Each structure stands twice: as structure tokens, then as C-alpha cells.
């Protein structure tokens, strides 16, 4: 017997829905009239904004409701509560018991009382410094994630024992009785003093913030696997200072201390040295089993063969003057090689192992690269800033799927130079060559034409496979229907495109459209009805919006809208709206029915006070 999906009982379908996003659930239900009745029987697990769902008859089926509070009038049922950055009012008795995630904005300074934050809240973030007391159970025991900065000294019990994730800056030098013993992730700042009781056993992720520069003395627990030092840390390290289970180790900007044998434990797989590190590295210092190594800008030491373990697969070298690399220095199984600045030798098999999949050619390198030099295994290729040589067929290997040209590259292309395997092409600042049909191979999906590009395009130059197109900064050539292929879904126009755009030039499949400047002679309906994300600039001539913004747009950004925005300009579909330069009154025509995020000039703050109870996220920066 043939089983149809309609034969499945409702409970089975609802259970399947638990593995889908809410958007996928809706799409599934609307494919069949039979399933549409499940809308109010299904639970929705993604985060949804209160303004978009609170009037729905199945509102109680949404498990996560987000609300941005600009006043202390907060509706019940909110689970994700964010106080906007301008908010600084009393919240006693105002936070619903349904809240699970709570964020206080940058201006919040009011004192909190025990019970103000209800038990049940699991995550609290203070975005700015909070210098009022949190003693006496102000942070409830249900909280497992806390981000908190204060210039006060904390006492034992201020931070609940159940905390698992803690990001803390306070005025205590000793934190032994402050940090709960259950913490797994810890980020701490200021120059605290470590002792044997400071850090809890069981901690796995430890991040020292910017100012820490204290002695380690072996006080980091053995359970730590992820360790990051802040930019100010520059203390000598002894054996056992870095625990034997650390897998990820990162040093900050200032660290420049000798590294001797066994200081870095054999467990480390990912190692990153900071900006000023410039110490000799002897053979045997770096652990066997290391996978990723980063040497930063000031490193200027000769690397002998065998210093970098053969297990390393990712190597990042940032110095401006790399010492010559001899045979045996580069591991034979390397997959990612990123030499950023300068290399005083010719690229050959000494430097380029046959296992490479990612290669960045140094910025200062400008020697011809013949076919066969770059290994066939490379799939992602970046040329440095100075590279400006004619490319032969075969220079870019046939397996490359992403190629980025540097700032100065400005050479003509011919068919076959860029292989058919390439999916993404990014030209650099100076590129301004006439492109012919076939120069960009069919199969390319992402094409960035470079800031100086200003050449006429004929139909077929941009292949029908392209979905993401950036016309660069200077492009100002007339566009006719068909020049931008129908496959394109994302387009960015240049800052200087002062030409009229006819209806049909922008294909009907485009969803993301960045116009920068809109010329006055455009057809009123030149923006297709498929666009969901729209950005445009009205220029300095104080013009009105005299073209239609489609009802499909949900994310809208308008620059230099100096005249008042009247009715029927902003469609009701818009959920995120940015009118940064707008000086007019914020009205119902702007806020609409569905806007949940509004970005306006700080000068306009008083202009939207009457909308503060809508739960909208207001941004003034």
C-alpha cells in the first residue's frame, strides 16, 4: 500500500516540525491546504519580535518572544528582554517572570533590589559599567550566563554558584571567593592576582582581558583547554604555567618572552603569537601535533628546518620582512599558507607543498608566476597588493574555486586564464580592463569588479551563473536590459552611478539591492518586486522619494532623506528601517505596522517618544 504524507497522524508531523526552523514549518504548511490547520497546533522555537506576533491567534505557541524596552511598560510573555541604550528607569516589579534572557543597555544605572530580576532568568548582560551593588541575591540563582563590569569590589555570593559562563571586570585583585566553582567559561579583566584558589577546577575556557599582566605561577587549572592572554600580558613563562590539556593558545599584542622547551605543552593544536613577538624558536620547542601556527608582524627570526612540526596544516606569517625560507622549513603536509607582507625569494616548490588548498601570495611579491608553480591542490587563491603581472592559462590551477586579485592588478584577461572551476572572483582597486564574453567563465557565482572598474558591459560578459554582483566604486556605464543576468539575486551599484535605470535592467530575482545613489530619471517602478533588502542614497539635492519601494522590502536603509517622509512611501512590509540623516518628524507613516528596528539620528530622539511602548529596537549610532 502506498503511504502518502496525508496519512501521517498529526502528532508525527508536529514532531517532525521540531527539527525544522519556524520559516521552514510555515513553508511546509502552506504547500498543502490539509496542513494549514496545524498552524495553531505547532510550537515555534525561533526568536520572534513581539510586535510581529502578539496579535496572532496562536501567540501562545511562540516559545521565544523578543522585546526592546524603551520604557518600563513591558508586556507579559516576553522571554528575551533588551533595554534600549537610552533607558535608565526603575525596573522594580516590571520584568515579567517569563524572561529568560535579559540585557541592560549602556545608560542603565538604577539600583536593583533582590527580586527585581525574577528567578528563571538564565542569561544577563550589562552592556556598560554598572557600579551599584549586586549583593543580597540581586542576581538570581537561576542565572547561568553573566556579563558584568563594575568598578566596585564584589563579595562572596554576589555571583550565584550556578553560573557556567562568566565575563567579569571588577575592582578585586583577589577573586578566589568571587568566581563560582561551576564556571566553565571565564573572561576576566584588570590586573588580578592569581593564586591556587582563584580559578575553579573544571574551567575549560579562560580568556584574560586587555589589562591583565600578572604572573601565572602554575595557577591555571589542568582542565583548561582554551587559553587566551590579553594584549598587555608580557610575563616569562615556566614549565607547567600552561596546563597540559590546553588545545588552543593565543598570546596578545605585547607578549615577547623567550619560549623554551616544554613551556608549550604537547596538547596544543592551535598556537597564535601576538604583534610584538620576536624570539628565536628552536627545534623541539613547538609541540608535535601542532596544527595551526600564527607568527605576527614583528617576528623576524630565521626558521630552521624542523622548527615547524610536520603536523602543521595552517601557517600564517605576518611580518613585513620574512627571512629566506629554506628547504624543509615549510611542513610537507601544509594545507593553508598565508604569507602576508613580503617574501624575498621566488615562489617555488620549496615554499609551496603539493598539499596546499589555500594560498595567499605576499603583498609585496610581483614576480611572474608560470603555469605549474601553484600546486594543483589549491582551491582558494589570493594575490597580494602589488601583484600586477600578465597571467597565462594555467597560472591559476584548474581546481581553484575562489580567486582574489590585489590592489594593483590591472592586466587584460583572456578566455581560459580564469579556469572554469572558479566560483568567486574579486578584482582589486586598480582593475579597469575591458571584459569580453568568456573572460569570466560560466559557473562564477560571486563577482566583484573592483573600485576603479568603469568599462562598458555587453550582454553575456557577466555569465548567467552569477548570483552576487558588485559593480565597484567608479562604475558609471549605461546598463541595458540583459546586461545584468537574470540569475543575479544580490547587486551593489557604485557611488557614482548617476544614470537613469529603466524597468527590467535590475532582474526580477534580485533580493538584496544596494543602489548607493538614485538618479532622478529612473523609472518609477525600476526596483523589482522581489527585493527584500534595499539601500539607497537620495543625494544632496533635497529630493523626495519619487519612485516606488516594493511591498516585498523588509529591510530598508535610506541615506540623506532630508524632506519629510509622507504616507504610502514606506511599505508596511518593512521590519528594519534606517533613516540616519532624517530630520523630519517620526510619524505613523514611518513606524508603520511591522517596524521592529529603527535607526535614526540622535537629534531625532524626542521625535519618536510616542512609539517607545511598541517594543522597537531604537538605534542612534
UniProtKB/Swiss-Prot annotation:
FNIP repeats lie at residues 87-128, 130-171, 212-254, 255-298, 299-342, 343-386, 387-430, 431-474, 475-517. Keywords: Repeat. It holds the Pfam family FNIP. Coiled coil: none annotated. Residues 2-47 form the F-box domain. SUPFAM superfamilies: L domain-like. CDD domains: F-box_SF. SMART domains: FBOX. InterPro entries: F-box_dom, FNIP, LRR_dom_sf, STK_FNIP-Repeat. PANTHER family: FNIP REPEAT-CONTAINING PROTEIN (PTHR32134:SF92). This is Putative F-box and FNIP repeat-containing protein L60. It comes from Acanthamoeba polyphaga mimivirus.
Amino acid at each position: 500500500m502506498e503511504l502518502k504524507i496525508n496519512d501521517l497522524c498529526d502528532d508525527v508531523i508536529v514532531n517532525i516540525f521540531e527539527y525544522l526552523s519556524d520559516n521552514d514549518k510555515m513553508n511546509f504548511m502552506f504547500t498543502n491546504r490539509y496542513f494549514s490547520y496545524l498552524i495553531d497546533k505547532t510550537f515555534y522555537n525561533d526568536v520572534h519580535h513581539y510586535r510581529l506576533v502578539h496579535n496572532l491567534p496562536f501567540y501562545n505557541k511562540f516559545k521565544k518572544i523578543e522585546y526592546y524596552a524603551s520604557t518600563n511598560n513591558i508586556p507579559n510573555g516576553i522571554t528575551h528582554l533588551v533595554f534600549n541604550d537610552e533607558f535608565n528607569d526603575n525596573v522594580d516589579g516590571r520584568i515579567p517572570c517569563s524572561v529568560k534572557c535579559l540585557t541592560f543597555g549602556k545608560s542603565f544605572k538604577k539600583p536593583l533590589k533582590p527580586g527585581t530580576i525574577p528567578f528563571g532568568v538564565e542569561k544577563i548582560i550589562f552592556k556598560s559599567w554598572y557600579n551599584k551593588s549586586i549583593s543580597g541575591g540581586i542576581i538570581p540563582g537561576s542565572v547561568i550566563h553573566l556579563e558584568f563590569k563594575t568598578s566596585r569590589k564584589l563579595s562572596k555570593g554576589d555571583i550565584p554558584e550556578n553560573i557556567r559562563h562568566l565575563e567579569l571586570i571588577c575592582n578585586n585583585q583577589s577573586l578566589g571567593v568571587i568566581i563560582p566553582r561551576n564556571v566553565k567559561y571565564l573572561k576576566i579583566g584588570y590586573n588580578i592576582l592569581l593564586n591556587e584558589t582563584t580559578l575553579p577546577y573544571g574551567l575549560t575556557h579562560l580568556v584574560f582581558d586587555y589589562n591583565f599582566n600578572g604572573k601565572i605561577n602554575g595557577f591555571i587549572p589542568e582542565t583548561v583547554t582554551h587559553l587566551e592572554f590579553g594584549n598587555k600580558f608580557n610575563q616569562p613563562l615556566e614549565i607547567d604555567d600552561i596546563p597540559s590539556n590546553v588545545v588552543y593558545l593565543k598570546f596578545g599584542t605585547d607578549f615577547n618572552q623567550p619560549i623554551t622547551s616544554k613551556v608549550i605543552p604537547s596538547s596544543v593544536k592551535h598556537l597564535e603569537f601576538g604583534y610584538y613577538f620576536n624570539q628565536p624558536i628552536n627545534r623541539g620547542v613547538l609541540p608535535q601535533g601542532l596544527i595551526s601556527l600564527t607568527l605576527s608582524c614583528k617576528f623576524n627570526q630565521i626558521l630552521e628546518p624542523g622548527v615547524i612540526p610536520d603536523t602543521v596544516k595552517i601557517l600564517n606569517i605576518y611580518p613585513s620582512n620574512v627571512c629566506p625560507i629554506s628547504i624543509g622549513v615549510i611542513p610537507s603536509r601544509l594545507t593553508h599558507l598565508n604569507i602576508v607582507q613580503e617574501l624575498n625569494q621566488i615562489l617555488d616548490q620549496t615554499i609551496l607543498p603539493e598539499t596546499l588548498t589555500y594560498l595567499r601570495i605576499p603583498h609585496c611579491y610581483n614576480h611572474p608566476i608560470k603555469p605549474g608553480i601553484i600546486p594543483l591542490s589549491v582551491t582558494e587563491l589570493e594575490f597580494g597588493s602589488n601583484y600586477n603581472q600578465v597571467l597565462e592559462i594555467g597560472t591559476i590551477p584548474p581546481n581553484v574555486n575562489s580567486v582574489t586579485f590585489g590592489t594593483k592588478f590591472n592586466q587584460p584577461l583572456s578566455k581560459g586564464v580564469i579556469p572554469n572551476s572558479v566560483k568567486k572572483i574579486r578584482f582589486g582597486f586598480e582593475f579597469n580592463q575591458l571584459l569580453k564574453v568568456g573572460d569570466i567563465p560560466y559557473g562564477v557565482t560571486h563577482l566583484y569588479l573592483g573600485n576603479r572598474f568603469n568599462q562598458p558591459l555587453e550582454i553575456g560578459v557577466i555569465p548567467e551563473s552569477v548570483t552576487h554582483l558588485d559593480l565597484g566604486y567608479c562604475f558609471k556605464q549605461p546598463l541595458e536590459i540583459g546586461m545584468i543576468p537574470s540569475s543575479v539575486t544580490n547587486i551593489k551599484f557604485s557611488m557614482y552611478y548617476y544614470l537613469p535605470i529603466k524597468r527590467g535592467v535590475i532582474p526580477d530575482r534580485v533580493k538584496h539591492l544596494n543602489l548607493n545613489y538614485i538618479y532622478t530619471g529612473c523609472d518609477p517602478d525600476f526596483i523589482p518586486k522581489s527585493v527584500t533588502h534595499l539601500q539607497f542614497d537620495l543625494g544632496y539635492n533635497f529630493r523626495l522619494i519619487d519612485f516606488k519601494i516594493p511591498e516585498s522590502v523588509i529591510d530598508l536603509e535610506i541615506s540623506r532623506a532630508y524632506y519629510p517622509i509622507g504616507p504610502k512611501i514606506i511599505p508596511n512590509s518593512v521590519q528594519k528601517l534606517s533613516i540616519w540623516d532624517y530630520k523630519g518628524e517620526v510619524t505613523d507613516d514611518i513606524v508603520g505596522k511591522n517596524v521592529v528596528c529603527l535607526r535614526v539620528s540622535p537629534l531625532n530622539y524626542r521625535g519618536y517618544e510616542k512609539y517607545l511602548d511598541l517594543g522597537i529596537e531604537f538605534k542612534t549610532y
